[in-house]
Amino acid sequence: MKNDTLNDVINSIKNASRLGKREIIAEPAAKLIGKVLKVMQDYNYIKSFEVIDESRGGKFKIVLNTTINNCGVIKPRFPVKNENLEKYEARYLPAEDFGILILTTTKGVMSNIEARKLGIGGKLLAYVY
């Protein structure tokens, strides 16, 4: 039984990137994982992803870029106000304007950059740089 499927997918991406693999198969194909992958694709951390198995659980086929230095899931999922985003950026990202935090908000899953532009906070899910 898998307890944290987002963590499994993020770790699969990190391990495959370190080994130099170009694509991976990750499961299950949950909506939240798909939205996190979409944010990573928008910032060119992955080239593409698609659902390849529509059966129970499903699977993602993820094509990687070579730009991922590190990525991980943030646990526990801290609720963050817009004013406090900078504190968590300093904690999880190595430098200013290098990498993204992925958070879930009332407007959907987005990066810290988009959340700052909209002036909203949310719960931290992951970091990528």
Swiss-Prot record:
PANTHER family: 40S RIBOSOMAL PROTEIN S15A. HAMAP family: Ribosomal_uS8_A (MF_01302_A). It comes from Thermoplasma acidophilum (strain ATCC 25905 / DSM 1728 / JCM 9062 / NBRC 15155 / AMRC-C165). The gene is rps8. It comes from the Archaea. One of its GO terms (cellular component) is ribonucleoprotein complex. InterPro entries: Ribosomal_uS8 (IPR000630), Ribosomal_uS8_CS (IPR047863), Ribosomal_uS8_sf (IPR035987). The keyword Chloroplast does not apply. This is Small ribosomal subunit protein uS8. Keywords: Ribonucleoprotein, Ribosomal protein, RNA-binding, rRNA-binding. GO terms for molecular function: rRNA binding; structural constituent of ribosome. Part of the 30S ribosomal subunit. Belongs to the universal ribosomal protein uS8 family. Pfam families: Ribosomal_S8. GO terms for biological process: translation. SUPFAM superfamilies: Ribosomal protein S8. One of the primary rRNA binding proteins, it binds directly to 16S rRNA central domain where it helps coordinate assembly of the platform of the 30S subunit.
